Amino acid sequence: MLIVEDEVMLALELEAELQSMGIMVCGIAPNIGDAVALTMKEKPNLVMMDVHLEGPQDGVEIARWLGEMYGVPVVFVTAYADNKILLERIHKLIPGAPVLSKPLDSSHLSETIADLKNRPPPSGFMSRR
């Protein structure tokens, strides 16, 4: 799993939580450029993506691209999970993508990951190489 989060402490806490669940974290990317590079290098089976990242693109746009190019599913994490406009945008670009609210609830995180592991890639996404 790849974590894309620009808040260092939150990323480290999430990494520790995932590792305690037995999930291997292949890297932490604090920005979009690092997220793309790590995805190309590590080919993660899942990405935890912060919605709001520094740069010309946000987490939603890059998640869509990662899915199209690598077929990797994305779980979004945001402090704005109650923002209807944001949720509509996410679900329009990536139908069915889970959105978790910060701070993360461990049991909800675990259930979401288990659910994604059992789903086929969204239609229109290329299969992973």
Residue ranges and their predicted role:
Residues 5:
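Conserved acidic carboxylate
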Residues 12-20:
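Charged docking surfaces used in two-component/phosphorelay signaling
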Residues 22-30, 38:
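Short hydrophobic/Thr-rich beta-strand motif most characteristic of the beta2 strand and flanking loop
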Residues 31, 57-61:
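Acidic catalytic/metal-coordinating carboxylates
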Residues 42-49, 53:
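Active-site beta3 strand of CheY-like receiver
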Residues 60-69, 88-92:
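Short amphipathic alpha-helix used as the core "switch/output" element in two-component signaling
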Residues 77-79:
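Hydrophobic/aromatic residues positioned on beta-strands within the core alpha/beta folds
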Residues 101-116, 121-126:
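C-terminal output helix
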